């Protein structure tokens, strides 16, 4: 999220060029809204959302707040208890990595605070994977091609299907 102080600090030295350089340095290929529409879902079809951790996230867009309606009106956030408690009471050094007011005004009933890993059906699990943050979590799916783990360090298709990668090495 560009409102996160860390990213604001990175953009500041570029002055007026920052908006010109943004699509070159960090292009946006798709938005959540575009993908939801493309696969034939409506925002009200989404029941749950989750993140590997809450750095840089402004959850108000998706879950709503006292001032703004939710893009996903029926969705609840699945989040590890440690992560949720930390984001509500950030230490000064942590604030640089969090969107200002990113959880402010969210209805507490939209938060499902988990104390351990959980199964989400027969072939999907949300696993507590502390390390990067105390509340980091990873999605693990059992697919016809084996296990697929989606976590913090998976940032491109090459991370998830290295056998198809065109990156040398």
Predicted regions: what is each one?
Residues 1-34, 138-154:
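Conserved beta-strand hairpin/beta-sheet module of binuclear metal-dependent hydrolase folds
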Residues 60-64, 87-92, 137-140, 161-163:
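A short secondary-structure junction signal
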Residues 17, 21-75:
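Active-site metal-binding motif and surrounding structural segment of the metallo-beta-lactamase
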Residues 53-60, 85, 133-137, 157-159:
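Active-site environment of divalent metal-dependent phosphoester hydrolases
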Residues 47-53, 78-80, 127-131, 149-153:
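Active-site neighborhood of phospho(di)ester-bond hydrolases with catalytic His/Asp-centered motifs
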Residues 118, 130-131, 142-144:
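Short polar/acidic secondary-structure junctions
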């Amino acid at each position: 999220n560009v409102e996160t102080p860390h990213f604001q600090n990175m953009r500041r030295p570029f002055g007026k060029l920052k908006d010109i350089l943004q699509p070159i340095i960090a292009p946006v290929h798709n938005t959540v809204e575009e993908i939801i529409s493309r696969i034939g879902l409506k925002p009200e079809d989404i029941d749950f959302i989750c993140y590997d951790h809450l750095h840089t996230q402004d959850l108000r867009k998706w879950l709503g707040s006292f001032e703004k309606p939710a893009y996903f009106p029926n969705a609840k956030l699945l989040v590890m208890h440690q992560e949720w408690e930390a984001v509500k009471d950030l230490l000064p050094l942590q604030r640089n990595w969090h969107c200002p007011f990113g959880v402010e005004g969210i209805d507490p009933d939209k938060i499902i605070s988990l104390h351990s890993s959980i199964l989400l059906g027969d072939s999907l699990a949300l696993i507590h994977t502390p390390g990067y943050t105390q509340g980091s979590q990873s999605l693990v799916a059992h697919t016809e091609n084996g296990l697929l783990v989606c976590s913090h360090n998976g940032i491109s298709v090459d991370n998830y299907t290295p056998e198809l990668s065109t990156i040398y090495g």
